[in-house]
């Protein structure tokens, strides 16, 4: 215990010396993260031994110490790699190499020169959000070579240049869905308006199948599902009220009637799915029998029922029952199923009412068009991407506020590519010829590259090259027009970002 306390105190003294010196060298930052790693390892070891306090310092749980040690190792490896680049002699502060700056958007990049960007929604100064734009961003390419690039802002969002490609790490349309009611925003830097109010009812690259969801998401306190339910319910209520007025012609006899109606409505929703499956199974073997039972039961029982919330299937059965003659209704009211229904009504229990309503609903579900209409309406909001939309987007896909399904739909419209495999010189000659002969049939050509083994730097297989297109149609025209060299094979693909 004393040995651990002494080592911990030595680490604390060394950290304090680094903080007081505040050196702006990369060597000092590497030493700082090395001490943080040793501190996390020491606290992890102490917790394993059951020690909960070292001096005045409480020992955190094992998971916390393990996470901090892994963070320190990751940052230290990145700094050691940066030390071998041409940017090692630049001034580096504790803020520039902190984990908070490293994990800030864009994530896992070293950044310098923070500049606040204010975005005002709906022309209301109180409804604003502040983002960070970085003057310099450092990133590595596929060959682990460090590059230094600049960052910029436009009406779409904040980006940094990766070669000739704009990589957006902040998209204003994502937060406009939450904070804006009209879909307008204004971009300001240092209190100067850079871009006038921009209107975006649907964010760029959003598939048409999500139009309803995006529109509903503009209201902050209302979800898409609740909005769709509120829009569908007013259309059903007048029909139910009108039917009840024609059918019964009187008001509820007590104050507890609305509560009973709510309980019956909830029971109807709980038993709807089970009644559908049972009715489908029965309809396979005895379609005629189920229809005759539904007709006789509907005509005999519905005049005596006092249920107030039954939906469109019940209203349809009532109208059909109303067309029958009184004589026929009297003759069919003596059926055994009617007596069963009366016994369930006299029971008065919530459970009995649920079974009675479910039985009636099972027999009349074969003539009800409601499930088909409802499923059709729900599936229209989550339909897939049409073939004409595939390959339309050429921007990075946003992962915010869309969910897994929304991201899959967004990625379905990513720009298509063709992967070409062959000898390096053959691919280079093919690229040079295609630039001259087939201009306009493609967007970009990549340089030749190869896969590398995980435990060495040895190149695996033949060289590869990517060809980018703006749409699937352009890729099809290119593939049908171009004659590939001998020994070269191709395959299709899509990328979520360039």
UniProtKB/Swiss-Prot annotation:
Compositionally biased residues, Low complexity: 199-228, 280-298
Q: Where is this region: DNA-binding domain?
A: 414-498
Q: Name one Pfam family in it.
A: PPV_E2_C
Q: Where in the cell is it found?
A: Host nucleus
Q: Which InterPro entries match?
A: E2/EBNA1_C_sf, Nucleotide-bd_a/b_plait_sf, Papillomavirus_E2_C, PPV_E2_N, Reg_prot_E2, Regulatory_protein_E2_N, Regulatory_protein_E2_N_1, Regulatory_protein_E2_N_2
Q: From start to end residue, where is composition biased (Basic residues)?
A: 265-279, 301-332, 343-361
Keyword set, alphabetical order: Activator, DNA replication, DNA-binding, Early protein, Host nucleus, Phosphoprotein, Repressor, Transcription, Transcription regulation
Region of interest (Transactivation domain), residue spans = 1-201
Cysteine disulfide partners in this protein? none
Q: Name one GO molecular function term.
A: DNA-binding transcription factor activity
> What are the start and end residues of every segment in region (Disordered)?
196-399
Assembly: Binds DNA as homodimer. Interacts with protein E1; this interaction greatly increases E1 DNA-binding activity. Interacts with protein L1; this interaction enhances E2-dependent replication and transcription activation. Interacts with protein L2; this interaction inhibits E2 transcriptional activity but not DNA replication function E2. Interacts with protein E7; this interaction inhibits E7 oncogenic activity. Interacts with host TAF1; this interaction modulates E2-dependent transcriptional regulation. Interacts with host BRD4; this interaction mediates E2 transcriptional activation function.
Family according to the record:
Belongs to the papillomaviridae E2 protein family.
Function per UniProt: Plays a role in the initiation of viral DNA replication. A dimer of E2 interacts with a dimer of E1 in order to improve specificity of E1 DNA binding activity. Once the complex recognizes and binds DNA at specific sites, the E2 dimer is removed from DNA. E2 also regulates viral transcription through binding to the E2RE response element (5'-ACCNNNNNNGGT-3') present in multiple copies in the regulatory regions of the viral genome. Activates or represses transcription depending on E2RE's position with regards to proximal promoter elements including the TATA-box.
HAMAP family for the chain? PPV_E2 (MF_04001)
Q: What is the recorded name of this protein? A: Regulatory protein E2
Q: What organism, scientifically named, is this protein from?
A: Human papillomavirus type 8
Lineage of the organism? Viruses, Monodnaviria, Shotokuvirae, Cossaviricota, Papovaviricetes
